[in-house]
């Protein structure tokens, strides 16, 4: 039977499948056509995310049904060289205790008028 897979970009992929095919098999066919690894794919049908071990018949997916393909979000790990850069620009500062303005490390008074150019400041907390 033929089913359709619609991506977030609006592209529609046509797949030839059997109702006994598992979701893993469908993801493999999508990889063969589009080059998207199965571990990055999430398939949605009737508002439900489809689980790898189940079959198309388990979800009552019939001929000419449309599945929606969304990509799995990636983790937010910062590359080590970018961490060093972030520390250089963000952590060598002092913070006003009254208005929380970030100030230059050698600042004597705050630059903001709302705290009365206070001289009460603390070092900015370091990134972990």
UniProtKB/Swiss-Prot annotation:
GO terms for cellular component: cytoplasm; nucleus; ribonucleoprotein complex; ribosome
Record GO biological process: translation
Listed Pfam families: Ribosomal_L40e, ubiquitin
Stored InterPro entries: Ribosomal_eL40_dom, Ribosomal_eL40_sf, Ubiquitin-like_dom, Ubiquitin-like_domsf, Ubiquitin_CS, Ubiquitin_dom, Ubiquitin_ubiquitin-like
Domain Ubiquitin-like: 1-76
GO MF entries: structural constituent of ribosome
Alphabetical UniProt keywords: Cytoplasm, Isopeptide bond, Nucleus, Ribonucleoprotein, Ribosomal protein, Ubl conjugation
Any coiled-coil regions, as ranges: none
Placement of covalent cross-link Glycyl lysine isopeptide (Gly-Lys) (interchain with K-? in acceptor proteins): 76
Crosslink feature (Glycyl lysine isopeptide (Lys-Gly) (interchain with G-Cter in ubiquitin)) location: 48
Entry keyword Ribosomal protein: yes
Misc: Ubiquitin is encoded by 4 different genes. Uba52 and Rps27a genes code for a single copy of ubiquitin fused to the ribosomal proteins eL40 and eS31, respectively. UBB and UBC genes code for a polyubiquitin precursor with exact head to tail repeats, the number of repeats differ between species and strains.
Family: In the N-terminal section; belongs to the ubiquitin family. In the C-terminal section; belongs to the eukaryotic ribosomal protein eL40 family.
Name of the protein: Ubiquitin-ribosomal protein eL40 fusion protein
Source lineage: Eukaryota, Amoebozoa, Discosea, Longamoebia, Centramoebida
